[in-house]
Amino acid sequence: LIEAGIHAWENDYDIKLRNKRGKFKKPVGFWLPEMAVNQITLNVLAKKGIHFVFLRREQIEAGEEASIYEIETDTQPIYAFVTDTEISNAISGGTQTKDAEDFYRRHQSLIDNRSRPPMLANDLETIDHHHPMMRFFFNYLFRNIFGGDNNPDNRFTRGTAMIKRGKVIDNTSWTCPHGLGRWTGENGCQCHAGGGIDDHTIKDRKDHYMLLRSYLDNVVNRLHVAAGERNWQMPFTRWLVEQHKNLSCGWRISLASVDASFQSLFKELLINIAGLQSCGWYFGKESNLERDIPQGCLQALRLKTTPTGPIEGGS
């Protein structure tokens, strides 16, 4: 699936950055989904040539503060860029991002009162998607406030001086230190998607999650039975790569290249992945479209057919 993601990245952005031999320069970093991460996740990423990920400080076990942590894996070290949760979230999900100077005043203590430079991490959909004109906000913030003539004491520094050793805390998420405990009630999570979510919604999310996990276990078991001695994982990954354009454009998926004994099961597995990886578990108001994705996937699985529209959500 990581290989499928790299292939999709090349297709999406029509990457023309090539090395001297004319080959694609593959991405070396990975923005993890909202799902929980553990050491196994990092082992797989490192084995596939990924060198760094973004994590929150709450996800790292370490004796020293740093901006970057080196985490051992089965093959090679992987580096975790530790982002500052409060200020990063204020940019991604806050409403006070129309005035850069006002934003800085509101969060100055988060920026100034620390022994290391703040590290902000925001996915690209933040810019001009969640917040129109966000690129101008960033432009002004960094050029006129964080650096430049107005603040001659602000300087960029080499990150290597900030690297310390650490370990990932299993089953945590960059959106919540409790991972899916936000909806399942595990790990004593009280985050509730940023607050303001009632008990009914929490129960609804938990029920959806448990049902999707049940469907996932069921379809994987049936795939093992249908495959017998055959390997179904690699054919599924290849098919997923083939369908990337259809999925990203909202077109119907094609099962023409899939063995007849796998077609229905591959379709169910794809819908399950969309439901379990959806941002809808974590973000948006109750009326937000993203909240409907897990429920829509459950409905499609119950009908054992694909939705009439595009399969949305997830990573």
Model-identified regions with their sequence ranges:
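Acidic, His- and aromatic-enriched active-site or binding-groove loops in soluble protein domains
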Residues: 3, 11, 15, 46-82, ...
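Catalytic domains of cell-wall/extracellular-matrix polysaccharide-remodeling enzymes
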Residues: 14-63, 126-141
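CE4/NodB-like, metal-dependent polysaccharide N-deacetylase domain
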Residues: 2-32, 108-121
